[in-house]
Design a protein with these regions (language model features):
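Surface-exposed, short loops/turns at beta-strand junctions within beta-sandwich domains
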Residues: 79-84, 152-156, 259-266
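C-terminal beta-strand-rich structural cap/linker in extracellular carbohydrate-active enzymes
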Residues: 159-160, 778-797
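Substrate-binding/active-site clefts of carbohydrate-active enzymes
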Residues: 300, 304, 312-499, 519-531, ...
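Loop/helix patches that line or flank the sugar-binding groove of alpha-linked glycan CAZymes
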Residues: 301, 317-336, 583-586, 592-760, ...
Length: 797
C-alpha cells in the first residue's frame, strides 16, 4: 500500500545541520525513516532542502527503489525479508548522501465485535489511528456473526471504540472503560511488552587529543557471547557514511575516530548496531569545532526551555491600553483583562525569566482582533471576546490593547539582548469574519454549508482540512486557492523578517494541509535560515494519534509538535496511585521510535486548551471530567491541599528531565489551578500576590529548570529505563559529557530501592543535585531512599 511515510524521526532537525548551507550541499540532517511492511512513499523535500532535486539513487540489495522525478518522491519496498537499520545511498551534485531507513515488523492484535443483528458497516477506531472512523473496517469473513480485524500495535495503553452504522459503541466484551470527556466512554486495551532481545548502545565517553577526537560506545544485548562485527555497524558523519577505516572495534566496544578537517564546523555523528534483524538505539553526538554539545557556548534548539505566555493574562505594563469590551452578556473571564507586550518587557527587564531559567518565550497571537463580542455556537452559547488573539482581523497590525509593531520589535530586541528567543503564535487556519481578507477574497475560504445541508462546524475529523471552528471564523481553503496559500506563507515569513523573531507556535496544524507547511518551511529556509545562518523553530499543535502528529514533523515541514500522546499517558499516570509508570515508559519508547531520542517535541503539563494539572491533583476534577466547563464558570477550583503542590513538583521534575523541549505554561511555576477554558487562563500573579506554598513551588521549579540548563545529558542524552512500576520511575540519561539518573516516587510512602547501573559505566561517585550530598555505590548497585511524592536527580561519575 503506497502512502507518504508518517513515521519519520524528528530528532535534530534543521538545527542539527552539518554547517551553514553552502552551494551544492545538504544542510539538513536527513532523519531515519520508519518503513511500513509493504511500500513507503517519501517526498524528498520532507527529507532535506535543496534548490534542485536532481538525485540518482544507488541500488541496494535490501530494497527496491523507485524514483518519481516528476512528483519528487521515492518509493521504497523492502525485499529479502529485510528488518533492521540500513542506509539508502543517493548522489546529488557530485556528492553521495545516505537516507537511514528502519524496518521493524510489529505483532498484530485481534479485535472482535459481535453485534445483535447484521450491521451494514463496522469499523474499529481509536488512538492508534487518530480516531479515524473509516480506515479500519472489520469483516465477518466466515459468516459466524463476529466482525474481526488484526492491527499492528506497540506496547502501550490504547483507547478505542467501534463505529457501527454511524454509531459509536464501546466494546461490550471489554469491561475496562474510561470517560472520554464528551459524556461517553472509551474502551481501553493494554498491550504488554513481550520478551525479546533487549539491545542498547551505550556511550562510554570521549578522548580528546590535540587534533583528534575519539568517541567510545558499548553494545549490550542478552547474548553476552555475541561480539560486534563491522558489517553490523551503521555509522554516519552528517549525511555521509562514516569512514570504515576510522571505526575501531574491540569486542563490544566501538570507537569512532575523528581528526583534522572532520572536526571543523558543526557536525552530527550517528551510530547504531544491527543484530539478527533488530537494531539498537541510535546514538547521536553533536560537535561544534571539535567540542561536544554542552561543553561550549554554542547552542542548538535542543537547549530550548519554553515559557508560554497568554499576553492578556500575564502582566499589565501599560494601563492606558487596558480597555475591556462592553457587552451586557459578557463575563470578565471572557473579556480583556489588561496584559500587554509592555508587561512582558517589564518582566524581562525585571529578571523574572532569568531567575526562573527559561530561555524562549512563546507568546500568544499579537495580531489585531475584533473589537466586538461574539457568541459561541455550541450550547450554552456564551459570549466571548478575542482577548486570546485567535480571532484575527488583520495580517500585519498588532492588537492595540497589546501595543504596536514598534513595541513588538523592541520586545524581540530586548529578549535577544538577554539571551532569550521569541516565538510568535501564528494562526494559519482561519480569520475572523471582520478580516478584510474574507470580505475581499471570499474564494480563498471554504464554504460553511456542506452539500448535505449540514454546517461544516467543528467536524474536526470528518472534515479535518475544511471545518470552521465558529460561524464567524472562516477557514482557509488552501487546497483550492493557491492565492491564499501564497499570501499566508508570505505573511508568516514577513512576521519573522519584520520582527526578527525566532520562530512560531502554529495553531491547529492538523486542520491545515501539508502543502501549506511545506511551502512555508521552504520559504523560511531559502529566505531566512540559509542566508542569515539562523535556526528557526516551528512547533505545531495537533490533537490526534502519533502517526498524524508525525506526518507534519520532518525537515520539510515543522521541527516539532506538542507531544500530546505522551501527555495523555503521563497525566493519569502521575495522578492515579494505581497507574503504573510502565505504561508511561511504553509511550516514551514509542515516542523515541517515531521522533528519536534527541527530538524537539514539546512536552507539557498544562496549556491554554487543557484543564490545569492542579485541578486534577487537588481533587476538584477527574481526568476527562464532563463538568470541567461548568466548573470554569460556576465553581472555579482552588487549591485546598498542600500535598497538591508536591504532586506538581514531581511532574515538573519529570518534564524537565526527559528528552524533548519542556514547555512551561504561565502559572505552572507557582501551581496555578483552573478548570477548562477560560478558567485555565487566569491572570498571572507575582511576588507578594503568592502564598507561601506558591513561593516554594516557584523556587523548586526554578531549581529544576536550572538543573536542566546546567547538565547537557538532560538536553542531549539517551534514555535508559532502570525501573518503572506503580511507584517508581527511574531512568538514566547519558551523553559524552556525563550521566544523570532521575528517580520519581509518586507513592504516598517513602521507598527504598536498589538500582543496577550498567557495569561498563564504572561509577565511582554519586552526587545528589538536589541536596549536594555525595556517596559511593556498591560496585554497580545504588541503594536509594526517596521520600513520598519526591524526586531525586543524581550525577553519576
Amino acid at each position: 500500500m503506497k502512502h507518504i511515510s508518517l513515521l519519520m524521526f524528528a530528532a535534530l532537525l534543521s538545527v542539527l545541520s552539518c554547517s551553514p548551507q553552502k552551494q551544492n550541499t545538504i544542510s539538513d540532517l536527513i532523519q531515519p525513516v520508519n518503513l511500513s511492511e509493504d511500500s513507503t512513499t517519501i517526498l524528498l523535500s520532507d527529507l532535506f532542502y535543496a534548490e534542485q532535486y536532481n538525485v540518482k539513487f544507488i541500488p541496494n540489495r535490501n530494497f527496491k527503489i523507485s524514483h518519481n522525478k516528476k512528483e519528487n518522491t521515492v518509493l521504497i519496498t523492502p525485499i529479502n525479508n529485510f528488518t533492521g537499520l540500513d542506509v539508502i545511498s543517493f548522489e546529488l551534485n557530485n556528492a553521495t548522501y545516505e537516507i537511514p531507513v528502519k524496518q521493524e515488523f510489529k505483532k498484530k492484535y485481534l479485535f472482535t465485535y459481535k453485534p445483535a443483528g447484521k450491521p451494514k458497516a463496522v469499523n474499529l477506531f481509536g488512538q492508534f489511528n487518530s480516531w479515524n472512523r473509516q480506515n479500519l473496517p472489520m469483516k465477518d469473513e466466515n459468516g459466524d456473526g463476529v466482525y474481526e480485524i488484526s492491527i499492528p500495535l506497540d506496547p502501550g495503553r490504547y483507547e478505542y471504540k467501534f463505529y457501527v452504522d454511524s454509531k459509536e459503541l464501546v466494546d461490550p466484551a471489554n469491561p475496562v472503560k474510561v470517560p472520554n470527556g464528551m459524556g461517553d466512554f472509551n474502551s481501553v486495551r493494554v498491550i504488554e511488552e513481550e520478551n525479546k532481545d533487549k539491545m542498547f548502545l551505550h556511550v562510554l565517553g570521549s578522548k580528546k587529543k590535540t587534533d583528534a577526537l575519539d568517541l567510545k560506545f558499548y553494545f549490550e544485548n542478552s547474548d553476552k557471547s555475541n561480539l560486534v562485527k563491522p558489517e553490523s555497524i551503521v555509522a554516519l558523519y552528517d549525511n555521509e557514511k562514516f569512514p570504515s577505516g576510522n571505526i575501531g572495534i574491540n569486542g563490544r566496544e566501538i570507537t569512532l575516530k575523528l581528526n583534522g578537517e572532520k572536526l571543523k564546523g558543526n557536525h552530527a555523528l550517528r551510530i547504531a548496531v544491527n543484530r539478527m534483524g533488530n537494531c539498537s538505539n541510535i546514538q547521536t553526538v553533536r560537535l561544534n569545532n571539535g567540542m561536544i554539545a554542552g561543553t561550549s557556548d554554542y547552542k542548538t534548539l535542543n537547549d530550548n526551555i519554553i515559557y508560554c505566555i497568554m499576553i492578556d493574562r500575564f502582566f499589565d505594563g501599560d494601563t492606558t491600553n487596558s480597555i475591556p469590551i462592553k457587552h451586557d452578556s459578557l463575563f470578565t473571564q471572557a473579556n480583556y483583562e489588561g496584559g500587554d507586550l509592555k508587561g512582558i518587557e517589564d518582566k524581562i527587564e525585571e529578571g523574572y525569566f532569568d531567575k526562573l531559567g527559561v530561555n524562549t518565550l512563546w507568546i500568544s497571537p499579537i495580531v489585531d482582533n475584533t473589537n466586538n463580542a461574539y457568541r459561541e455556537y455550541p450550547a450554552p452559547h456564551r459570549w466571548y471576546t478575542g482577548y486570546h488573539g485567535y480571532w484575527p482581523i488583520s495580517s500585519t497590525k498588532v492588537e492595540e490593547r497589546f501595543g504596536n509593531m514598534n513595541l513588538a520589535k523592541d520586545l524581540v530586541k530586548l529578549a535577544h539582548h538577554k539571551g532569550m528567543k521569541i516565538l510568535w503564535d501564528y494562526v494559519a487556519h482561519h480569520v475572523h469574519q471582520e478580516d478584510p481578507l474574507f470580505k475581499e477574497h471570499p474564494d480563498w475560504f471554504g464554504k460553511l454549508k456542506l452539500p448535505d445541508g449540514r454546517l461544516n462546524l467543528r467536524l474536526f475529523d470528518e472534515y479535518r482540512l475544511t471545518t470552521w471552528f465558529e460561524p464567524y471564523m472562516p477557514s482557509f481553503d488552501y487546497t483550492d486557492s493557491p492565492e491564499a496559500l501564497k499570501y499566508m506563507t508570505d505573511n508568516a515569513v514577513w512576521w519573522l523578517k519584520t520582527t526578527d523573531a525566532d520562530g512560531f507556535r502554529h495553531d491547529a496544524v492538523k486542520h491545515v494541509p501539508n502543502k501549506f507547511w511545506r511551502l512555508l518551511t521552504k520559504k523560511i529556509k531559502s529566505e531566512i535560515e540559509i542566508p542569515e545562518n539562523k535556526n528557526i523553530y516551528q512547533i505545531g499543535e495537533t490533537f490526534g494519534g502519533i502517526d498524524l502528529i508525525a506526518s507534519y514533523v520532518n525537515n520539510g515541514q515543522l521541527n516539532a509538535q506538542f507531544n500530546f500522546n505522551l501527555y495523555d499517558v503521563a497525566i493519569p499516570t502521575f495522578l492515579n496511585e494505581n497507574a503504573s509508570f510502565r505504561l508511561l515508559d511504553y509511550q516514551m519508547q514509542k515516542s523515541f521510535q517515531v521522533f528519536g531520542y534527541n527530538n524537539l517535541m514539546g512536552n507539557i503539563m498544562d496549556s491554554h486548551d487543557k484543564i490545569r494539572y492542579m485541578a486534577y491533583a487537588d481533587g476538584d476534577l477527574e481526568i476527562n471530567d464532563g463538568r470541567a466547563s461548568d466548573f470554569a464558570w460556576n465553581n472555579p477550583p482552588r487549591v485546598d491541599h498542600s500535598s497538591s503542590y508536591e504532586k506538581l513538583k514531581l511532574y515538573m521534575a519529570y518534564l524537565l528531565t526527559i528528552p524533548g523541549v519542556p514547555v512551561i505554561y504561565y502559572g505552572d511555576e507557582i501551581g496555578m489551578t483552573g478548570a477548562s477554558d477560560p478558567d485555565n487562563r487566569r491572570m498571572m500573579r507575582f511576588g507578594d500576590q503568592l502564598n507561601e506554598y506558591e513561593k516554594e513551588t516557584l523556587k523548586e521549579v526554578s531549581r529544576l529548570i536550572h538543573i536542566r540548563k546546567d547538565h547537557s545529558a538532560l538536553r542531549y542524552g539517551d534514555f535508559l529505563t532502570l525501573q518503572s512500576d506503580e511507584n517508581i520511575y527511574a531512568y538514566l540519561r547519558s551523553d559524552m559529557n556525563e550521566r544523570i539518573l532521575t528517580i520519581l516516587n509518586k507513592s504516598k510512602e517513602a521507598q527504598k530501592l536498589v538500582l543496577t547501573v550498567p557495569s561498563v559505566y564504572n561509577i565511582k561517585i554519586v552526587h545528589d543535585l538536589g541536596n549536594g550530598n555525595e556517596y559511593q555505590p556498591d560496585k554497580n548497585k545504588l541503594t536509594i531512599e526517596i521520600p513520598s511524592t519526591r524526586w531525586k536527580i543524581l550525577l553519576l561519575n
